[in-house]
Amino acid sequence: MKVKFKGKEVTLEGTEIKVGDTFPDFVAVNSSLEPVMLKNTNRVRVFLAVPSVDTPVCDLEVKTFNARASEIDGVSIYTISMDLPFAQSRWCGAEGIKNVTTLSDYRDRAFGKNTGTYIKELGLLARAVFVVDSSNKVTYANYLEEVSGYPNYDEVLQAAQAAK
């Protein structure tokens, strides 16, 4: 899998996730610094891997999914980055984010390494989107070729709706 960050090719560590795969286990950290595992939630989930919520591209991506979350009622949306939970919480509060849950991968990098989104050179996550159904099967996986690009919002929302 080849991914670029601002035009320069970077190395992704971990295993690339494909449609049909079982979504891997991981532990992330919530805004209260508590560990969170999401494997057996018995609902459809959208995972947005982003480098940092506090950058213009990530900011717009999360705000867009937050605004459009009602289009996929009953689906949980998670944004995961290497940001510290305090920074994520501050940003969400300042931006009024209520329909997307932020999680941090700073502690163990388990999400990044288990989904093949961890950028070795930068210690950040590559931009990727995964839709996971209630039986923990991946129904949509997209690693953006350029980390500074935007996902196809309509395509992701359609995939999430279809996974219900």
From Swiss-Prot:
Pfam families: Redoxin. Keywords: Antioxidant, Disulfide bond, Oxidoreductase, Peroxidase, Redox-active center. GO terms for molecular function: thioredoxin peroxidase activity. It comes from the Bacteria. InterPro entries: Redoxin (IPR013740), Thioredoxin-like_sf (IPR036249), Thioredoxin_domain (IPR013766), TPX (IPR002065), Tpx_CS (IPR018219), Tpx_Peroxidase_subfamily (IPR050455). Disulfide bonds join 58-92. SUPFAM superfamilies: Thioredoxin-like. Residues 17-162 form the Thioredoxin domain. It is an enzyme of class 1 (oxidoreductase). Its EC number is 1.11.1.24. The active site is at residue 58. CDD domains: PRX_Atyp2cys (cd03014). It catalyses: a hydroperoxide + [thioredoxin]-dithiol = an alcohol + [thioredoxin]-disulfide + H2O. The active site is a conserved redox-active cysteine residue, the peroxidatic cysteine (C(P)), which makes the nucleophilic attack on the peroxide substrate. The peroxide oxidizes the C(P)-SH to cysteine sulfenic acid (C(P)-SOH), which then reacts with another cysteine residue, the resolving cysteine (C(R)), to form a disulfide bridge. The disulfide is subsequently reduced by an appropriate electron donor to complete the catalytic cycle. In this atypical 2-Cys peroxiredoxin, C(R) is present in the same subunit to form an intramolecular disulfide. Homodimer. Thiol-specific peroxidase that catalyzes the reduction of hydrogen peroxide and organic hydroperoxides to water and alcohols, respectively. Plays a role in cell protection against oxidative stress by detoxifying peroxides. Belongs to the peroxiredoxin family. Tpx subfamily. This is Thiol peroxidase. The lineage of its organism: Bacteria, Bacillati, Bacillota, Clostridia, Eubacteriales.
